Design a protein with these regions (language model features):
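Conserved AMP-binding/adenylate-forming core of the ANL superfamily
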Residues: 1
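Generic structural marker for isolated residues within well-ordered, non-membrane alpha-helices
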Residues: 4, 32, 123
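Phosphate/pyrophosphate-binding loops at sites that engage ATP/ADP/AMP, CoA/4′-phosphopantetheine
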Residues: 5-17, 126-131
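Beta-strand segments within the central parallel beta-sheet cores of soluble alpha/beta enzyme folds
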Residues: 15-24, 45-48, 75-80, 136-142, ...
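Conserved catalytic cysteine-centered active-site region
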Residues: 24-78, 82-118, 156-182, 214
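Active-site-proximal alpha-helical scaffold in enzymes
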Residues: 51-81, 116-150, 190-196
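N-terminal extracellular/periplasmic Venus flytrap/periplasmic-binding protein-like
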Residues: 139-215
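Conserved small/polar residues in nucleotide/adenosyl-binding loops
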Residues: 217-219
Length: 219
C-alpha cells in the first residue's frame, strides 16, 4: 500500500482515479482486492500472474491491453517483497526457504533452486546458437551500473566495466557473480494510463511505445 500510495501522490492521482491493479505471485504476494480495499480503490480489473523477474515488464504490456480494451482506465502495477530479510531463494537456516509446490517438485528437489540456475542453460543455448559472448552478456551489468550510479535510491552506485564482470567468480556457468542480481527488500509501483490522462499528471509522462514477448525454452 505504501508504494501505491506514493505512486499516486507522485502522479497527482487519487484512489478513485485508479480502477485496475496488476501484480505477480512470488510466495508472499498480497492479492489486489485486499490491497485495493485498504487504499479505497474500486477495481474494474485485476490480475495476479505467476512469475518473477521480468514479470513487471510483461504486466506493463497487459496493462496497455486492458486499457485499450476499455476494461479500465488506469492501472497500478505493484509488488512488495522481502527478498532479503524473509523468504530467500534456496534459503536455509535462520531465513526460510521458498516452499516446493506444483511443477517445482520436478526440479527444486534436485537442486535447481535459483533464477541463476534456471536461466544459465538459456544463456548457454543462446551462446551456442548465436555466438553470444560472456563479454556481451556482461554489457548488461555495465549498463545497469551506469543507470544505478545516477539513481539516488539505488543500493549500489559503483560503475562496473566489462573486465570487472568477467573477472568476478563464476556462479552458474556462464553467469558470473556480477551478472546476477541482488536480493533486496523492496516495494514499488508503476502507474499506467492513457496518454491524454497522463498529460494531466504532475510529471511529464513516459510514453510506452511497444512491448514484446517470448516463449522461453531452457534447453
Amino acid at each position: 500500500t505504501w508504494a501505491i500510495s506514493n505512486a499516486m501522490v507522485d502522479a497527482g492521482m487519487k484512489p478513485e482515479d485508479v480502477d485496475g491493479m496488476l501484480s505477480y505471485s512470488g510466495n508472499d504476494s498480497t492479492h489486489a482486492p485486499w490491497v485495493a480495499g485498504d487504499l479505497g480503490i474500486r477495481l474494474n480489473f485485476y490480475m495476479d500472474v505467476h512469475g518473477g523477474g521480468s514479470s513487471t515488464e510483461a504486466l506493463i504490456g497487459i496493462a496497455m491491453g486492458v486499457i485499450e480494451a476499455g476494461m479500465c482506465k488506469t492501472v497500478a502495477i505493484y509488488r512488495a517483497m522481502n527478498g532479503y530479510s524473509a523468504v530467500r531463494i534456496g534459503g536455509t537456516g535462520a531465513r526460510s526457504a521458498v516452499p516446493i509446490t506444483g511443477d517445482q517438485i520436478h526440479h527444486r528437489a534436485y537442486g535447481w533452486q535459483s533464477a541463476g540456475q534456471m536461466f544459465a542453460p538459456t544463456f548457454l543455448r543462446h551462446m551456442y546458437d548465436y555466438g553470444t559472448t560472456p563479454e556481451q552478456v556482461a554489457g548488461v551489468k555495465v549498463a545497469h551500473s551506469k543507470h544505478a550510479s545516477n539513481n539516488p535510491k539505488a543500493y549500489y552506485k559503483k560503475r562496473y566495466t566489462i573486465d570487472d564482470v568477467i573477472n568476478s567468480r563464476i556462479i552458474f556457468k556462464p553467469l558470473h557473480l556480477l551478472d546476477c542480481c541482488v536480493e533486496t527488500d523492496n516495494a514499488t509501483c508503476i502507474i499506467v494510463t492513457r496518454t491524454e490522462r497522463a498529460r494531466d499528471c504532475i510529471h511529464p509522462p513516459a510514453v510506452i511505445q511497444s512491448v514484446v514477448g517470448l516463449s522461453l525454452i531452457h534447453i
